[in-house]
């Protein structure tokens, strides 16, 4: 192999590596921005769900309706959001399998990965010793990130293969 071919090969390799690292950094920074936006939106949705449920409970109590576990379960199940309701350490209801395992503290936020899905789980205390735990599906966000990274790496491999064929 001639000197200029070695030099060109080395240059292509260095450029490919730098573009590869730069592309991955861009993909992950974009993912971080999207994840932050989702976290903000999910936190707002959780706060709204807490406010609406608390308002319903207070309204029913004001009318003299007793809020037993069945009434609370009906209120939680009426929501479109997967949720679990706790009274102290006692689970009242859970609308998503697995949420009964998350007796989180007030204002806690965790990201949970199951075999098939990724969820952002939020917890907040309500009046009367109740704690509402809600879950928001992030599976699509993580799936899109993985697909973009796969496409990028395949493109990077194709560029390296083309460069190898040319040199």
Question: Model-found features: residue ranges?
Answer:
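Juxtamembrane membrane-water interface segments immediately C-terminal to a transmembrane helix
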Residues: 28-57, 148-151
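Membrane-proximal, non-catalytic sensory/regulatory domains of signal-transducing membrane proteins
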Residues: 96-131
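Juxtamembrane loop-transmembrane helix junctions in multi-pass integral membrane proteins
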Residues: 2-6, 144-147
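Inter-domain helical "communication" segments and dimerization helices
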Residues: 83, 97-106, 138-139, 149
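Membrane-interface helix-start motif
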Residues: 136-156
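Extracytoplasmic/periplasmic helical hairpin
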Residues: 49-99
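Extreme N-terminal signal-anchor transmembrane helix of membrane signaling/transducer proteins, especially
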Residues: 3-29, 157, 161-162
């Amino acid at each position: 192999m001639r000197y200029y071919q070695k030099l060109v090969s080395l240059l292509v390799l260095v450029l490919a590596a730098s573009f590869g690292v730069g592309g991955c950094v861009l993909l992950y920074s974009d993912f971080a921005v999207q994840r932050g936006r989702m976290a903000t939106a999910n936190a707002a949705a959780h706060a709204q769900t807490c406010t609406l449920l608390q308002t319903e409970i207070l309204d029913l109590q004001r009318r003299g309706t007793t809020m037993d576990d069945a009434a609370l379960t009906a209120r939680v199940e009426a929501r479109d959001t997967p949720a679990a309701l706790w009274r102290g350490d006692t689970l009242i209801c859970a609308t998503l399998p697995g949420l009964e395992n998350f007796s989180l503290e007030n204002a806690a936020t965790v990201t949970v990965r199951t075999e098939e899905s990724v969820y952002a789980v939020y917890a907040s205390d309500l009046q009367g010793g109740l704690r509402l735990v809600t879950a928001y599906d992030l599976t699509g966000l993580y799936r899109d990130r993985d697909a973009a990274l796969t496409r990028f790496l395949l493109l990077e491999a194709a560029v390296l293969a083309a460069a190898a064929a040319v040199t």
